A protein has these predicted regions:
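ABC family nucleotide-binding domain
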Residues: 2-148
């Protein structure tokens, strides 16, 4: 079953002689359950591609479909909702709020989306991540891996 389809994706930054091509007609299909790695030299477009897939950086042209849904075929409001509810990214450099504990950092996006926190799911996530004993710790009290 097709999970991700990218068709002729292009991304340009700047204009004229200062224009930089970050993505040049990238096409890719990933089936559900398939594991892929995106590798390349620094500046080769890896982060730009991932940001485009996640709906964070709008491509110059081309299409991205996640679970059959056209990521950029929706208005900005629906794209923001889609991003919050359907996409997850783990950055190399995390952006945790230093004054919030583990539980507060995990639940903040749900609360900002005006939804109720599912306590059972929260406890499952904490167990899966091995953070049950550290759920009230601040980010600076966690290892780098735990922060991710």
């Amino acid at each position: 079953m097709e999970f991700l389809r990218i068709e002729n994706l292009c991304k340009f930054y700047g204009k004229g002689e200062n224009q930089v091509t970050a993505l040049d007609h990238v096409s890719l299909t990933v089936t559900k359950g398939e594991f892929i790695a995106i590798v390349g030299a620094s500046g080769s477009g890896k982060s730009t591609l991932l940001h485009a897939i996640a709906g964070v950086d709008v491509p110059s042209s081309g299409n991205i479909y996640l679970n059959g849904q056209d990521v950029y075929g929706q208005n900005r409001e629906h794209l923001a909702i889609f991003r919050r509810r359907q996409i997850g990214m783990v950055y190399q450099f995390h952006n945790l709020i230093p004054t919030l504990n583990v539980v507060e950092n995990i639940t903040l996006p749900v609360l900002m989306d005006r939804r109720k926190v599912n306590q059972q799911r929260l406890n499952e996530l904490l167990a899966l991540l091995g953070l049950e004993e550290r759920k009230y710790h601040l980010p600076n009290q966690l290892s780098g891996g735990q922060q991710q």
